Regions:
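Structural hallmark of WD40 beta-propellers
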Residues: 23-34, 86-89, 135-139, 177-181, ...
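Short coil/turn segments within WD40 beta-propeller repeats
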Residues: 38-45, 94-98, 129, 144-148, ...
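Beta-propeller domains
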Residues: 1-7, 24-69, 95-113
Length: 376
């Protein structure tokens, strides 16, 4: 576990996100944000692993994250996304959606915008469970089954999809500029097109009988392949990693045994999507890597991975062998290696983010882990 710095922060960490870096620069990320949950006072915090955060204190180790600033957050931070270099959007268990501004010169945070009851039931608030940003647009989802579209610097709501779901929506991501994907508590993946009027999804895919037990397993997280937008990864209550091709059928293409309990987040590497990362309630963080130069799937870290292939159809475009590894688990065309990224621990790894060679994650063990040398 070389290259990992652990920082104990006395708060359960629910979300971790790197501040984006310019795509034209070759620099590695050095600033990240965290949100906390299940604490007496929750907060959003900004941390540095670069020169900004160098401390002369004797008890600080080189490379340890240094706290730059923090701000009290009303309710649990259920999701967190950078809108741009300066602004961060949070989703709260109170139903609120907040934009915070990070002032780099003074190293302070302030509330830039607040939609207090973005998600609600008739008589009380509903947790806002997910947020995704494509500046200036912000999409949120909640336990109330609503999808909300906001625009930064505009007070009102741009669009509301009422009763988008009769069950709780757990996560959201952009598929394309005008299309989003949501996952819900009954194992469904839904596609929505904001160009279409009305409250109906353009497509519904379902785990259904494809789950390990055949039951409707709640899905907790979703991410799309950065280059092949039709390829989507999800994770849920049963800990399985599901790969979907939204152009084909209405069930996942591949299911892979990943974790022994809930998978909280899954992320393709944004610039090297042959790499994927997942974290779980079981205390593990896995690095999945596709490879096409050997015939046998291998696993590092002492766990068995079984791959259930639903289809062996080769998708159009892209690196066929690497994409086939995601879609089919076909070891003759490509295979998956899985590596444990953290020392064994008992408490949940709630969130992760990866950018360049840097990975950050947050846990219920009140710790933040940073790895600056992820083998990508």
């Amino acid at each position: 576990m070389d290259g990992i710095n652990a920082k104990y922060v006395s708060k359960k960490i629910s979300k971790t996100r790197w501040r984006p870096v310019s795509s034209s620069s070759l620099q590695q990320p050095d600033i990240f944000a965290t949100g906390s949950w299940d604490n007496e006072d929750n907060s959003i915090s900004i941390w540095s692993i670069g020169e900004n955060g160098v401390s002369s204190m004797d008890d600080e180790f080189e490379g340890d994250p240094q706290l730059l600033c923090e701000y009290k957050h009303n309710g649990d931070v259920l999701d967190l996304q950078f809108l741009d270099q300066d602004r961060i959007v949070t989703a709260s268990s109170t139903g609120a959606v907040t934009i915070f501004r990070h002032h780099h010169n003074s190293q302070t945070l302030s509330v830039s915008q607040l939609w207090e009851r973005a998600h609600h039931y008739p008589c009380n608030n509903a947790p806002c469970t997910g947020v995704v940003c494509n500046s200036p647009e912000i999409v949120t989802v909640g336990e109330d089954g609503r999808i909300m579209l906001f625009r930064a610097d505009q007070e009102g709501v741009l669009r509301t999809i009422e009763m988008a779901d009769s069950s709780a929506i757990h996560a959201v991501t952009f598929l394309r500029t005008t299309e989003i994907l949501t996952v819900n508590s009954i194992g469904q993946l839904k596609l929505w097109d904001f160009r279409q009027p009305g409250n109906e999804p353009s497509q519904i895919l379902s785990l259904g009988g494809a789950s390990r037990t055949g039951d409707r397993v709640p899905l907790h997280c979703v991410d799309r392949h950065p280059n092949q937008q039709h390829i989507v990864a999800t994770g849920g209550q049963d800990g399985m990693l599901c790969i979907w091709d939204v152009r084909q059928g209405n069930m996942p293409i591949s299911l892979m045994e990943a974790h022994t309990s809930e998978m909280w987040e899954v992320h393709f590497h944004p610039s090297n999507p042959g790499h994927l990362f997942s974290c779980s309630e079981d205390g593990s963080l896995l690095h999945w890597e596709t490879s096409s130069n050997t015939d046998t799937p291998s696993l590092q870290g002492g766990r068995n991975t079984s791959i259930i292939s639903r289809s062996a159809i080769a998708p159009a475009g892209g690196n066929q062998s690497l994409i086939n590894a995601w879609l089919t688990g076909d070891s003759s065309k490509g295979h998956l290696e899985t590596t444990h990224m953290l020392p064994s621990q008992m408490l949940s790894v709630n969130s992760l983010d990866v950018l360049g060679q840097c990975l950050v994650c947050g846990t219920d063990g009140e710790a933040i882990y940073v790895n600056r040398y992820v083998p990508i």
